[in-house]
Amino acid sequence: HDVSDGGLLVTLAEIGFASRCGLAVDCSGLADDPLAAAFAEELGVVLQVAEADREAVEAAFDRAGIGNRLHRIGRPTEGGHLVIRHHGAVVFDEPLSALEQVWHETSHHLQALRDDPDCADEAHAAIADREDPGLRAELSFDPAEDVVAPLINTGVRPRVAVLREQGVNSHIEMAAAFERAGFEPLDLHTTDLMADPSRLQDCQALVACGGFSYGDVLGAGQGWARTILFNPTLREAFEGFFARPDTLALGVCNGCQMLSALREIIPGTSLWPDFHANRSRQYEARLSQVEVLPSRSLMLGDMAGSRLPVVVA
């Protein structure tokens, strides 16, 4: 971490915020004045090096002619405190959780004014929760197991319609993912089905891809859905597909929003939600911890009980 605004103390604090561990630091060799050592915004960088690699790092600095600029100042500790000593005296000792809340204070006030204040308060309070284990994966399945290999080896691949519309932009990687999972992808634009709705009859699966159909001008996924609902030919084709007992459908991102707006023609969707503005009043793009609950889903059923971080936008 480079030493910049706030000097060494802020640099060490930011390292502690990210690592969720304490730091024991001795700045005696940096300056006679501990304030100068802690807050000087001079050119520098803090490196964390494994003890086994320390001699090699020191040798590299010596070869570069800057070995005298290298100072061993501390180590990570348990307890969550940033402790700084100067010639044996403790000159600073504060919990990193409290320091992070101070560090985040300005952002918190700006967020409370700009966004939903309750959401801002919740995010600010969560900083102090050092018991939060953070994002992690607890899986009920082995991700290294190739569960589709036996099916692919049969030579019979179910056909999946990779559906796209004007503004959709993730159909290529979606087709690649389904191909790797044992499907035969079929690239279909909504206008393809307007010309020949029977093409959907040859598919056992349908995936509505992500992007920004019609630029979301009519609402997220709404214009795409209404293209289907208000076109009698398309509506009949999709109703027939969803009514078949041998089909499955997946909507991702904008495609999920589109499928939600089609629920009047999809059996068993009475509990599906509408998508409204976020409570935070902002676009949210996060890496979120989710849990897979038991369900009859063909895609998620064998993953029940798993907890893992997923991208949500």
Language model features by range: what are they?
Residues H1-F39, A50-R159, G167:
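Intein/HINT protein-splicing elements and their conserved insertion hotspots or analogous self-processing inserts
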